C-alpha cells in the first residue's frame, strides 16, 4: 500500500481474546512524503525516499496480513486497518499485597510520596482479604435472613493485616505513643500527605495509593507518583473484574463525594506505539517514566471509560450509579481523586484522536503490570 506521510505515528492494539488487531498509521505533523507500508506476520516495514524502517512485533505476537480489512482514513487521525492476530495469553495479575510472600515476614510501611517510614519492622503473621465493601448490601438484597455481621467492623490483631479493595487495615497500638482517636486522619510527618485514617482506637486504615509496603530488609522503591497511582488503580480494577465480574466503579473521596465514574472495557489488550522515523521507541508521554528503557514498546493494558463528576458534572448519572448495587465503590483520599482525574485527562490526550471518546465517556488506556 502507499500513503502520504512524514513522521508516521504507529499505534497497534492487539486483543488477545478476540484475536484481532487495530493498526493506526497517524498523520504527519507537517509536510509529507511518499511512504510504502508492508505488513508481515512479525513486523511492519516502512519505506520512504530517505530509507527504510522496520518495527518488529513483540515475541508471541503474529499478524495475518491477508486478513486486512476495515481499511479507512480518518481525518486528523490517519489510516486505520483491522487484521486478525494471535498473541500469547498474559500472566495472571499479581495481587497488590502478595499474601504468600508477606505473611511471616517483617515489613515496613512507607509514605509513597516522600519515603517516610510510617510503620517499621512489623511482623505480619496473617494477611487476610476483607469481604467486598458491597457485602452487606448484597446480603440484604439476596438473602432471606438478616446479616449477622451488619455494623460489626473487623479489627486486626497486632500482627494482622487485612486487605480491602483499595486499603490496608492494621493494628495501630504498638506503633503510636498515645492511643489514637477514631475517625481522624493519618498524616505523613514529613510531607503532610494524608496516608489514611483511624477506624477505631486500635485500627488504622492506609490507602494503597498512599503507602508502599516492603520487606524490612528491602529499600524504598522510588516510583514516580503518577505511575504509582495509575498502576494501583489499574491493578485493583483488573482484580475486581476478574474475581467479582464487576465492571463499573465509582471513585469517591473519604468524605463520600463521587469524583469519577469508571467503566472497564477490557483488560486483554497488548498495546504498541513506536515512532517509525527513528530507531528509538516512543511511549505515551504519561508512561515514559513507567516503562523500563529495555522493556520494549509493547505493554499489557487495561482500557477504561471514565466520566468526571466534579463541579456538578454528570450529577444525575453519578446518583444513578451510586444507587446501583452492581456498581462497586473505591474510596481514596479526596486529593488523590483529583490527582487521578488529572492523570486520566493527560493519558486520554496522548491517545489517537479517534480512540479518545466513546459516546459521552472518555477513554483511559493504562499500563497494567502482571
From Swiss-Prot:
Residues 332-368 are annotated as: HECT-like. It catalyses: S-ubiquitinyl-[E2 ubiquitin-conjugating enzyme]-L-cysteine + [acceptor protein]-L-lysine = [E2 ubiquitin-conjugating enzyme]-L-cysteine + N(6)-ubiquitinyl-[acceptor protein]-L-lysine. Disulfide bonds: none annotated. Pfam families: HECT_2 (PF09814). GO terms for molecular function: cyclin binding; ubiquitin conjugating enzyme binding; ubiquitin protein ligase activity; ubiquitin-like protein conjugating enzyme binding. The modification N-acetylalanine is found at residue 2. Pathway: Protein modification; protein ubiquitination. One of its GO terms (cellular component) is ubiquitin ligase complex. The keyword Cell division does not apply. GO terms for biological process: proteasome-mediated ubiquitin-dependent protein catabolic process; protein autoubiquitination; protein monoubiquitination; protein polyubiquitination. Ubiquitinated by UBCH10 (E2 ubiquitin-conjugating enzyme). Keywords: Acetylation, Cytoplasm, Metal-binding, Transferase, Ubl conjugation, Ubl conjugation pathway, Zinc. Its EC number is 2.3.2.26. InterPro entries: UBQ-conj_enz_E2-bd_prot. It is found in: Cytoplasm. Signal peptide: none annotated. The keyword Hydrolase does not apply. Zn(2+) binds at residue 144. Coiled coil: none annotated. A motif (BRAT1-like motif) lies at residues 129-159. E3 ubiquitin-protein ligase which accepts ubiquitin from specific E2 ubiquitin-conjugating enzymes, and transfers it to substrates, generally promoting their degradation by the proteasome. Independently of its E3 ubiquitin-protein ligase activity, acts as an inhibitor of CPSF3 endonuclease activity by blocking CPSF3 active site. The C-terminal half (AA 188-389) is able to bind cyclin-B and shows a self-ubiquitination activity (mono-, poly, or multi-ubiquitination) in a HECT-like sequence dependent manner. The BRAT1-like motif mediates inhibition of the endonuclease activity of CPSF3 by forming hyrogen bond and hydrophobic interactions with the active site of CPSF3: Cys-144 coordinates one of the two active site zinc ions of CPSF3. Interacts with UBE2C/UbcH10 (E2 ubiquitin-conjugating enzyme). In vitro, interacts with cyclin-B. This is E3 ubiquitin-protein ligase E3D.
